[in-house]
Amino acid sequence: MTEFTTLLQQGNAWFFIPSAILLGALHGLEPGHSKTMMAAFIIAIKGTIKQAVMLGLAATISHTAVVWLIAFGGMVISKRFTAQSAEPWLQLISAVIIISTAFWMFWRTWRGERNWLENMHGHDYEHHHHDHEHHHDHGHHHHHEHGEYQDAHARAHANDIKRRFDGREVTNWQILLFGLTGGLIPCPAAITVLLICIQLKALTLGATLVVSFSIGLALTLVTVGVGAAISVQQVAKRWSGFNTLAKRAPYFSSLLIGLVGVYMGVHGFMGIMR
């Protein structure tokens, strides 16, 4: 059976490193806690670029620490399953978990957009029904429906942040603490990197994948924080595709995770059949 470690010894490790960076970057773009909370926090406190960088790095550090703790635990447990016959079954089980995670991410994003659009249509219908004299511009309505999308949970966090910090002076320690606590939220992409690390059974490469994921996450979070400090509105005006990219990021992320799961599942199945 061709194991992941054998593939890495053959010089194929380059595939996993950029994939981990891409997963981290896509996770940072997904609508949810990190991006929405950071942008809301920076805007509410009227933060500087330096504070935005601090916030992004703090969230990345805490996120990396959580992944490290889980990864070390997984690697310790995986040492009990060193038999050659157990390896393909572990790969197959991991593949099922990864593919299920990808499907859940895709379905959650699709359902969230559907519910959001249905609520918008319902609101417009009720408004039109109660006020026949008021007319909406169709072009503006279309743009509003397909504008920036946020799930209700993330928007609630953003509103709460605005109420708590609007107009207040905050210290660097408070900014770091906010970033550290925000980065503790687990994500499906980090779970995928964890499962890959367990299958590789290589501490050095596992650490590299975790660091690569963190680099991608840091690039996105710092960029979003700096963009919020400069002005998110200006960025959206200058680049019309920014909102579309942010809204579609979960689909790309789930597709990439699904491909990783299929790859692992095929190798696990081939190992079982031999």
From Swiss-Prot:
Presence of the UniProt keyword ATP-binding in the record: no
InterPro entries, sorted: Ni/Co_transpt_high_affinity (IPR011541), NiCoT_RcnA (IPR051224)
Compositional bias per record (Basic residues), positions renumbered to this chain: 129-144
GO molecular function: nickel cation transmembrane transporter activity
Lineage: superkingdom: Bacteria
One GO-annotated biological process of the protein: nickel cation transmembrane transport
Region (Disordered): 127-153
GO cellular component assignments: plasma membrane
Principal location: membrane
Transmembrane region(s): 13-33, 57-77, 87-107, 176-196, 210-230, 252-272
Signal sequence region: none
Subcellular location: Cell inner membrane
Primary role: Efflux system for nickel and cobalt.
Protein name as catalogued: Nickel/cobalt efflux system RcnA
Species for this entry: Escherichia coli (strain K12)
Underlying gene: rcnA
